[in-house]
Amino acid sequence: MGLSEEELKEGHRKRLRERYFRSDLKSFKDYEVLELLLIYAIPRIDVKPIAKQLLIRFGSLRRVLDAAPFELLGVPGMGPNSVGLFRLFKDIASRYLEEEVRSCDMLDDIEKVSDFLRMKIGGSKRELFVPLFLDMHNHLIAYDVYRGSVNQNNVTPREIVTQCLLCGASKLIIAHNHPSGVLEPSQTDIRFTRTLKMLLEALDIQLTDHLIVTGNLCHSIMPLIELYEKRPEYNSGL
C-alpha cells in the first residue's frame, strides 16, 4: 500500500528540515528558504506553491521579508501565523545585527553598520531617517528612527543637535533611505548635512558620515560634502 498524500507531504517537510541541518541554506533556492519558514507556520499542506507565489508577487526574498503584513496577507495561503513568523524572523535578524553594531568600533567596521542600516531601513517603502549617536570611542550610545526625510521637513538639524547633547554623544552618523533605489543625494540632503555639520562643530561634536541606504547598498555623501567645502564655486544653487 502506497503512502497517503499527507504522508508524502510530511516526508518532504522532514527532508527539507534535515537538508537544512546538514548544510544550512547555502544549497537552498529562495523559494526553498521561504518554504522552510512556512512549514513551521502552516501545518499539513504543501507550502511550496505559496513560497513560489510570494516570490512571483514581490520579486525577491528580501522584498518578501520587507513586505507589509497586509501585502503578505494578499497572497493566497498566507495567514496571521505565517505573516507573524516572517516578521519575527526579520526582527530577530535586526536585533542580531544591532548587537553586532553595539559591540564594534563603528568607524572601523562600517560593513556591520551598513548591514544594520540596510536591514533596518533599506527595504522600507517610506522614507526614514536614522541618527546613530556615538561616544568618543566610536561605540553606539543610542539611535532613533524618524519617519519622513529631511526633504519633507520631518527632521531638523537643531533637533538632531539637541538629541546629541541629551545623550552625550561625541560623534554622529546619520543615514536615510531612498525607496527609489537611487543613491544620488538631493540638494536638500546636501544642505541639511552641511548645516548639521556646522552646528555640531560649534559644539565640538563630529559628524562622521551621512549614508544613503537602499536594500542593497549604503553610499556615503561625505566626500561630496567635503568637495563643497573645498570648492566654494560648487555652492551655487544651495
Q: Residue ranges of each PLM-predicted region?
A:
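Long, highly charged, low-complexity intrinsically disordered interaction regions
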Residues: 1-72
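Long, charged amphipathic helices and adjacent flexible linkers at domain junctions
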Residues: 97-113
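Short loop/turn motifs at secondary-structure junctions and domain boundaries
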Residues: 122-125
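Short beta-strand scaffold segments in enzyme catalytic cores
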Residues: 129-133, 138, 209-212
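Glycine-rich active-site/cofactor-binding loop and its immediate structural neighborhood
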Residues: 139-148
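Short HxH-centered metal-ligating active-site micro-motif
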Residues: 149-188
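Divalent-metal-activated hydrolytic enzyme cores
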Residues: 151, 194-238
